[in-house]
Amino acid sequence: MRRGVRHAKKESSPVRYKEQLTAFVRHLRRGCQALLLCAVAQAAQAAGGSLAGDIGASLQEEGLSGAVWSEVRDDGAISTGAAGLANAASKAAMRADTKVQVGSVAKVGLALGVLRLATENRLALDTPLAQILPDLKLKNAWQGSDPVRIRHLLDHTSGLDNVRFWQAFSSKAAAGTPLADAFDGGGGLLRVRDRPGSRYAYSNMGYGILGMVIEKVTGQPYERYLDAQVLAPLGMKDSTFGFVTQTGAKPDARLAMGHFEHGVTHAAMPMYLRPAGQLTTTAQDMARLAQFLLGDGKAQGSAFITPALMRMLSRPNGTEASQAGLDAGHGLALAVRDRHNVVGECHPGTTAGFRAMLCIYPEQKSAFFIGFNTDAEHADYERFNRLLMRDLELPLRPPAAHGAPAPTVENFQGVYVPAPSPMASMAWLDAVFGFVRVKWDGDSLFLIPFQGEPKELEPVGGFLFRASDRSAPSHVLLQTDGRHVLSDGLHSYERVSMLRMLVLWGSLALGVIGLLYVLVVGLWRAAGRNLPRNDHLFAPLLSLLALLLPLPFFYFQSFMRLGDVTFASVLAALVTGALPLAVAVGLARCWRTRGTGAVEKLDAIPLLAALQLLLVLAWWGLLPLRLWQL
């Protein structure tokens, strides 16, 4: 009995009845879940629809052009398939041997290249990065005790930022652009935000640096090394880490065209951080990669990667969450993925015009890969994973048993913000809009985000919890350096004071109200021909309306140039930089005419509210809006 005074007659205790009822409901819920799993499995088997037919129908329902896929069965057999269109413009059909681009799934292959070098003793995973790339200057406050090591780059615990706009959206990158050019972006680009090794934070920059490591160790372009020393030994003869496109002087006719919503085509373009997301492959070749990942590290009968390193492919090591007992997280190449009551080891991928997913299930010796030639924001890609998992007939895992929570769980209640932010330049947006409220009701932990549906977590013992749509422990509460942290192994949140959040929210609310006042009252005065040039709102209103000027130029500009210095981006920087100055001018005019009437006071308050928000945005690096530096 967790609360109240212990009664002499237990059967008369309302608290006792509450606990018994709670336990009964919990067991009933778990029993229903188990029955539901069996029913779903039986229904799926009874449905009898072909995988190709189901995927084809799903592609149409989701508005996707086409897909290729492969499966590896427990007996080692490989099957491949395709559905939809390889090119929506030409109506060319997708074939099982059509090539696709897989985005960040390329990181798996690059990681294997690094592990191959480690197996050959050409580098060690614990080698500090500074020993290999001394000219690459990191801003690491923990350099003396915790330098960034090779393993930190592999498992995304280096503390480096993910990606900048100009690294991801630029037309200036060429197929042979030196990898170091991706890090020529100022002193704050390579700032380490957390103690290396302590916390997962996905970093495309980290894998860009790993490409440089491979080139330094091998003395050749990383693409050439990986093609010869990783893809060839694995039998991936139709794959390459080199740049491949559908257009230009040397188009690859087998490469599917990339698409966005409504069948808009997009040809492949070079990128700065190509080691993090450049791989052209086929479904058959990805099945061969999956077979290797399911094995003991041998390729063509010979040792390729040591078994010890193979065991670390998806096992998080040394992070705060793993030390607190959470098995979910990312290893040296893959992440643990718990979906639909099946736990696998996976890596997703996204690049312009393409999406992909690679999942292996070592216990069942099974795997699947699926690649899409459409990158659609609102499509449900998870439904395809469900279809492939169902077709593989993977056994369903019962939910982890309920366990007694730690007695101090209630002390973790409060408001949490992402730590670190997925993108350092977006930290203000993540703090204001990406926060999560943690609430404990005595039986379950609730995560209540500002955006999205609340999530209920069931305690499974101590500070470990399981989300209702997971089978294994999915979250952990922990304390580090006096900070309260919530983690699911791939995302970390730190508790912040309510006062800080109230200040941020209040600043935003007051600023928006102030800007709306300038817009509405200013336009009303202008409509009544009562807005002379010396009016307090004249300059602020003009500057506010000027924010519309860059929009048509952005509309006619390719989104792949968002990170470039273009007329549209320069104009956006100018008009956003002028806004706080214009508001300050209006406020100064109010000051000069103070005491002459109530209008001055009425205008001054919203102008002051607007100015404080603009200064806050400038402090966080969002004003002026320089897309080429974000």
Language-model segment annotations:
Residues 79-81, 357-361, 365-374, 484-488:
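Short, well-ordered beta-strand elements
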